Amino acid sequence: CDKFYTVREDGLSQNWGGQVVFCNPPYSRRTKKNPGQEDWIEKCCSESENNKITAVMLIPARTDTKSQHDYIFAHAKYICFVKGRLKFNDGADPAPFPSEIVVFTQQDFDEKIKGLSDLGFWIKLRE
């Protein structure tokens, strides 16, 4: 990436306008001290709709959550339920949960998505 935000820069408070964003947020839930995954999902949705950016998220597939229904199912254009479990540390430690790739965008990426079919099951949620 040409530009990235760490905890120090507080990516949630930055304007992402004009960017293509990859977001792999903390998987934790919101606390009084720290934003949670739902805050990042809301930010990606908002930036896509208000600033016309493309945001690609890699997050746990939590289809039962409010943010999944209110933001992802309601506003994302594409979602991929990743095949298998992501593996970390040279494949020795698979994630204890399924993952999904969520794309918030105003653009059409149908052809590019076809080339990523080996990652899992892709769904186009809206035109």
Positions of predicted regions on the chain:
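Class I S-adenosyl-L-methionine-dependent methyltransferase catalytic core
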Residues: C1-E127
